[in-house]
């Protein structure tokens, strides 16, 4: 059943631009109009305005998933998968010694390895049959892209041999039509257009896996064909809002401030590629652009003021089941929040609406976008919500603030320069302050343990001497 006016933007060179496809589109629109009155979701017509969008990532199909109830209660018209829609690969336990060593200087096998096609299909079916998710599929259109674990292998890129099989399985999970251009192209990127003229929302889904070069290469993320397609998308007909969905974070570069202890995947690991993306957005002069992303197992909202002709936001929601605080004992949750607060960042948006001082949220979460088309100026509320649907991070964005402006005026305004310094450009000591703090804490714990052990041994010796004397 079609509830919305949706135009699908196919990849360049596909047959969807032919006259025959135009006739088909008209036929689909006619069928949608005829079926609108029988929609199970009230009076939403194919031309209805889209104002409520939810998104999420990192959902382990074998874990409890109570968060779907909160997503259904939010009542989104569209739900966007941002990757790790299932965990399709397998992992060996951490082992420094033994026959299979997965970490350390004597590592001899990779920790992660792919599943068979049959096992991947079984996991997708398990995810799809979840009662909460099934209920969402009845009330919202579900679209999405992938990340590494549903691509088939942790941190994998273009070298992964099973990517074509994984592409077919993902598109089956998303109920993609058999004749969809996504089934013919190299990669799962695509776009959607919602709503009538004057209130249109475009959603661009990127593929950050199929064409991605190795992490240490500073090569390409999207590949030539996807870059060509994206340029046409951004320079195409205007829409009031354009949401660019990336499975990995675009603006934040945590690896620059948590290394060498921890590393995350992000566009920041490919600085030339990210600069190309910013330049493309700038040159397109397209208004209303912001990013949504996943992958990192916590939520945050970041902002970059010097990447275009207006501030660029990235709303990160991760994960639906996989979250940092879920893998540590509850009494260590404060330590996770303290670490997040102490980690240097130049891009994270601070707000009085944040539940924690760090303005990160490391429990199960999903993202929401609410568009108020009727107020002046029009407003977008973006939030990261917890497992019960309560907002943990929230930012209000005026649509008028996402309009191309005079670059000189923009750079001369302090308000638009707060989030201009890249993490990699921070002073060396400050950039690595997290590592120094972490190592200092570990050193203190080791010293405390040694002193405690020394005290125990000393007291024991004195007790034994006294016992012998007596």
Say what each PLM segment does.
Residues 1-27:
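Classical eukaryotic N-terminal signal peptides for Sec-dependent ER targeting/secretion
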Residues 22-24, 30-470:
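Metal-dependent phosphoester/phosphodiester hydrolase catalytic core
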